């Protein structure tokens, strides 16, 4: 599933093409994704100029004067920028095209767990949308600190890894990045969130920011489907310290990496480096 780094890589790849450009038309070939595509989306966006492209968590927010269209990539979704001249014929899983003067922005999603939604300006700020309002803080914002994590986890018995994945404290720390961040911070993923000290949470906040920044720099992680807007795969998975390295020696101490299951997801850690 595309997580924050993959969505941010997509945003950075798309924004230079669409910001300041007008949508000539929208071709909706699949009316039902995770939720129904708004029936009037094509008409709402016709001849509208894209003012900005923002990311909130794993959602992409495309602002036009009348509102925002919101895109979530789901499990297998991608957004590609394709030249209008000679654009490939839409394949089975190519659900929506936004046609601009010189290129096409194409949404592809084999499993159809992604979403394309519309938030009109008269409904208020897009960040008040029901899907966005309850999200945690952005990991690169000043609000994301070890003190925040420490305060929000007092008395919680859930594991620190599952607390990170929940998304109500901080957004975008998916399974890969939770395992990697906890390794960098030296925290065992099974530790109860409420028992992690403030200094260790301060290290964890720094580790989350560093891990996500490194992943964005490497184009995200491509484990199966993800490609950026230019069709290129990400390479962060090649740099992982622990994720998907069960039985292999720790890159720091040489101890074999262990794999366990937490909340039906695989977790990887070093039993020596992480306490």
UniProtKB/Swiss-Prot annotation:
DNA binds at residues 93, 111, 156. Gene3D superfamilies: 1.10.8.50, MutM-like, N-terminal. GO terms for molecular function: 8-oxo-7,8-dihydroguanine DNA N-glycosylase activity; class I DNA-(apurinic or apyrimidinic site) endonuclease activity; damaged DNA binding; zinc ion binding. Coiled coil: none annotated. The active site is at residues 2-3, 58, 265. It comes from the Bacteria. CDD domains: EcFpg-like_N. It catalyses: Hydrolysis of DNA containing ring-opened 7-methylguanine residues, releasing 2,6-diamino-4-hydroxy-5-(N-methyl)formamidopyrimidine; 2'-deoxyribonucleotide-(2'-deoxyribose 5'-phosphate)-2'-deoxyribonucleotide-DNA = a 3'-end 2'-deoxyribonucleotide-(2,3-dehydro-2,3-deoxyribose 5'-phosphate)-DNA + a 5'-end 5'-phospho-2'-deoxyribonucleoside-DNA + H(+). InterPro entries: DNA_glyclase/AP_lyase_DNA-bd, DNA_glyclase_Znf_dom_DNA_BS, Formamido-pyr_DNA_Glyclase, FPG_cat, MutM-like_N-ter, Ribosomal_uS13-like_H2TH, Znf_DNA_glyclase/AP_lyase, Znf_FPG/IleRS. One of its GO terms (biological process) is base-excision repair. The keyword GTP-binding does not apply. The keyword tRNA processing does not apply. Disulfide bonds: none annotated. Keywords: DNA damage, DNA repair, DNA-binding, Glycosidase, Hydrolase, Lyase, Metal-binding, Multifunctional enzyme, Zinc, Zinc-finger. Its cofactor is Zn(2+). A zinc finger (FPG-type) spans 241-275. Its EC number is 3.2.2.23, 4.2.99.18. SUPFAM superfamilies: Glucocorticoid receptor-like (DNA-binding domain), N-terminal domain of MutM-like DNA repair proteins, S13-like H2TH domain. Binds 1 zinc ion per subunit. HAMAP family: Fapy_DNA_glycosyl. Monomer. Belongs to the FPG family. Involved in base excision repair of DNA damaged by oxidation or by mutagenic agents. Acts as a DNA glycosylase that recognizes and removes damaged bases. Has a preference for oxidized purines, such as 7,8-dihydro-8-oxoguanine (8-oxoG). Has AP (apurinic/apyrimidinic) lyase activity and introduces nicks in the DNA strand. Cleaves the DNA backbone by beta-delta elimination to generate a single-strand break at the site of the removed base with both 3'- and 5'-phosphates. This is Formamidopyrimidine-DNA glycosylase. It comes from Burkholderia cenocepacia (strain ATCC BAA-245 / DSM 16553 / LMG 16656 / NCTC 13227 / J2315 / CF5610) (Burkholderia cepacia (strain J2315)). The lineage of its organism: Bacteria, Pseudomonadati, Pseudomonadota, Betaproteobacteria, Burkholderiales.
